[in-house]
C-alpha cells in the first residue's frame, strides 16, 4: 500500500510507548533506567576498546533503546491474536520454553525481530507465557479459571479491527500505525480492578500466585520491562543506594572477559492495591523490575557445555559466594573469542576490513577465517544472544513471587500443544544464529 510505515518503525514506536507507560505505572523502573544509563556510560568511558568494538558491530545505537518485556496470557485465542499483533511489529515467535521444570505452570516463547537490520535498529522482545490450565490439579478450580478466561477480551474492539485492516491491506499508513500502537498498548496496561471476587482470587492464588495473576485481571499487564546493561554486577551493587532492593542472586553465567548468553537480576515485585468484585480492597504482587546483560550466542556445542557446568554449579546462598563458585566451575569454559571460535562454541559475524575489500579476489569459499583475521583482512564479531534461558526465566519468576528456592524438576514440556495454540511452529534460535553467521561469511566470500 502507498505511504506504508515499516514494521521496524511500528516496533520502535510501540516499545517507546510501552516504556513510557511502564515508567508511569512503576516509578522504580524509571530509577532503574537512569541507573543503567549511568553505568553503561561509565563502562564505555573507561573502556574505549569496547566502545569502538560496539560501534563497529552496530551494537551501540541499539543499547539505549533495548528492552524486553514479559507478559502472561490465559488462552490459546489470546496467544494466537498476540502472534498477529506482534507480526505487525516485525516480531516472530522464537524458541519454546517449558517453565514447569521450575514449578511454574506456563510454557512460553519470545516474540522478537529476526533479521540483522531489524535487530540492529531495535531488538525489542516480549517473553510471552501461556497458562497451562491442565497443570491446575483441583478440577473445580481448573474449570472456574477456564470460565473466567472465556468471559474476557484482552484486546480493544478497535485493536481487533486494525488487525483485520492490516491483514487485508498488507500494511499501515502513519495515522493507522499510531492508532494501532495506542490500541495495542491497552492490552498491556495495568488494571486495578480485578474481574473476580476476593474468595476466587485467594483460591487461585493458593494454587499458584501466577495463576491468580493471569486469570483475575482484564488484560495481560506487563509484569516487567528490562533494560540492557554492560555491567550487571555494578548495577546490582548500586541498586540499594537508589532505594531498590535487588533479588539475592544474579541468574545465568558468571562474569567473564567475553560475556556469554544472558545474565539477569531484578528487584522484588511491588505490592499493589486492587479492587475485587464487590468493591472489596486487597493487594496483588506480580510486577517487578529487571536488568539484563547480554553476551555472545552459543552454538549447540557451547550451549551443552554451559548447561552441564551450570547443572554442576548449583546455587549459593548469597550472590558473592554464588558468583565465586560459578567462576570456579566455569574455568573449563574458554574465555577468549579466539578459543570460542576455534572450538566452535559461539556464533560470530564476519566482516571484511578495507584491506580485506582490496584483496577480495584472494578470499575463497571454504577458506579458514583465522589467517585472514591475523592478516587484518577479516574481523569476527560475536553475535549477541537475543533469546532467554529457561532456568533463569523461571528463577526470576520464582524469586519475584517470593520463592527463591523452588525445586526444579524435569518439567512437563508440551511444545506441540503450545504451537497449536500459537497457530504456527516456533522458530529455532540455533538456526537463526547459524544463518546470521553464514550470511556474513557469504558477504565476505568465505562461503
From Swiss-Prot:
Cofactor(s) needed: Fe(2+)
EC number of the protein: 1.13.11.93
Residues binding Fe(2+), per UniProt: 68, 224, 290
Enzyme class: oxidoreductase
GO molecular function list: dioxygenase activity; metal ion binding
Protein role: Catalyzes the decarboxylation and hydroxylation of 2-oxoadipate (2OA) to form D-2-hydroxyglutarate (D-2-HGA).
Protein name listed in UniProt: 2-oxoadipate dioxygenase/decarboxylase
Organism of origin: Shigella flexneri
Encoding gene, per UniProt annotation: ydcJ
